[in-house]
């Protein structure tokens, strides 16, 4: 059987029964030195009886009466949950749209988010490599450093390579990596 571990009840300090003149009741008389227990030791009904007739339980002031703060807190939490649910729904829809665009063979198995992003990244790189290969081969006699697209691609590769510490010499490496990855998904690994 599981028991609750509760801390011991705090007791009010024992009050000194000897009162000095001027202490005690507002009119200066001494309080009743009867056997009344300290405030913390009285029973619940005794405390309720000792309370003034107009005095009720303490309530926190709220925006719309008692419990209003709690209601507004619950309402804010519900609204926050709904916003998060909508955000996740939009994100999942975007991933599904990306899965439909990326060519992969295994239609019976849904790609995970990380697989989808990795395939998309490598697919974009392979398409870029293909475009660069096609555009540079169709421009015979180009004496400059190459078309603007190819220059931009080389700059991006140098920046990315410097940040990551490794560069690929040829854009064909991206195509090879993408086709290898597609093959591994085809095999089911």
From Swiss-Prot:
Identify the GO cellular component terms for this protein: chromatin; nucleus
Q: Which residues carry this modification: Phosphothreonine?
A: 25
Gene3D superfamilies named in the record: Helix-loop-helix DNA-binding domain
Q: Which domain of life is it from?
A: Eukaryota
**Region annotated Disordered, chain positions:** 1-85, 167-189
Primary place of residence?
nucleus
InterPro entries associated with the record = bHLH_dom (IPR011598), bHLH_transcription_factors (IPR050359), HLH_DNA-bd_sf (IPR036638)
- Its Gene Ontology molecular function terms? DNA-binding transcription activator activity, RNA polymerase II-specific; DNA-binding transcription factor activity, RNA polymerase II-specific; E-box binding; identical protein binding; protein dimerization activity; sequence-specific double-stranded DNA binding
The answer to whether the entry has keyword Transcription regulation is yes
In the record, biological process GO terms are: axon development; calcium-mediated signaling; cell-cell adhesion mediated by cadherin; cell-cell junction organization; cell-cell signaling; cellular response to glucose starvation; endoplasmic reticulum unfolded protein response; establishment of localization in cell
Where is it localised?
Nucleus
Q: Where is the composition biased (Basic residues)?
A: 1-12
Q: Name one Pfam family in it.
A: HLH
UniProt biased composition (Basic and acidic residues):
68-85
Ranges for domain bHLH come to 75-127
Instruction: Outline what the protein does.
Output: Plays a role in controlling the transcriptional activity of MYOD1, ensuring that expanding myoblast populations remain undifferentiated. Repression may occur through muscle-specific E-box occupancy by homodimers. May also negatively regulate bHLH-mediated transcription through an N-terminal repressor domain. Serves as a key regulator of acinar cell function, stability, and identity. Also required for normal organelle localization in exocrine cells and for mitochondrial calcium ion transport.
Comment on protein domains: Lacks a classic transcription activation domain and instead possesses an N-terminal region capable of inhibiting heterologous activators.
| Assembly and interaction partners | Forms homodimers or heterodimers with TCF3 gene products E12 and E47. These dimers bind to the E-box site, however, heterodimer with MYOD1 does not bind target DNA.
The protein's name is Class A basic helix-loop-helix protein 15
Q: Give the organism, scientific name.
A: Homo sapiens
């Amino acid at each position: 059987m599981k028991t609750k571990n509760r801390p011991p009840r705090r007791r009010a300090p024992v009050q000194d029964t000897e009162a000095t003149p001027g202490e005690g009741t507002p009119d200066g008389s001494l309080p009743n030195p009867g056997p009344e227990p300290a405030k913390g030791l009285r029973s619940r009904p005794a405390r309720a009886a000792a309370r003034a007739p107009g005095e009720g339980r303490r309530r926190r002031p709220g925006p719309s009466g008692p419990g209003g703060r709690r209601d507004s807190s619950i309402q804010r939490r519900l609204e926050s949950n709904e916003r998060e649910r909508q955000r996740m729904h939009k994100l999942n829809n975007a991933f599904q749209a990306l899965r439909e665009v990326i060519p992969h063979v295994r239609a019976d198995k849904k790609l995970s988010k990380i697989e989808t992003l990795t395939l998309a990244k490598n697919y974009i790189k392979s398409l870029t490599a293909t475009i660069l290969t096609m555009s540079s081969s169709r421009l015979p006699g180009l004496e400059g450093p190459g078309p603007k697209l190819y220059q931009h691609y080389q700059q991006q590769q140098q920046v990315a390579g410097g940040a990551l510490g490794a560069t690929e010499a040829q854009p064909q490496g991206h195509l090879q990596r993408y086709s290898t990855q597609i093959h591994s998904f085809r095999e089911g690994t």
